[in-house]
């Protein structure tokens, strides 16, 4: 499933990029085929993912540790399901 996550955060984009890469290396690769993180500005990004297990991805991003990171970094997101236009 092609997914877009529009995120805002209080940390720097560099810190957020590292967080996403670390998550993908440790856990996310089980649920995401590939991803592309795009910097909108220092505190906003667009993350495009090819999610192969939506339930697993949702569970992995909803752990107490992830929620604590979200809170500490002022993280907020809006998720969209993407479909190709023919």
Go through each PLM region and give its residues.
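Short S/T/G/P-rich N-terminal loop/turn motif that feeds into the first structured element of a domain
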Residues: 1-69, 76-86
């Amino acid at each position: 499933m092609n997914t877009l996550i529009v995120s805002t955060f209080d940390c720097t984009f560099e810190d957020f990029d590292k967080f996403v890469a670390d998550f993908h290396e440790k856990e996310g690769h089980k649920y995401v085929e590939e991803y592309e993180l795009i910097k909108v500005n220092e505190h906003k990004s667009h993350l495009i993912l090819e999610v192969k297990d939506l339930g697993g991805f949702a569970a992995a991003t909803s752990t107490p540790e992830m929620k604590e990171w979200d809170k500490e970094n002022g993280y907020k997101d809006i998720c969209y399901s993407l479909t190709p236009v023919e």
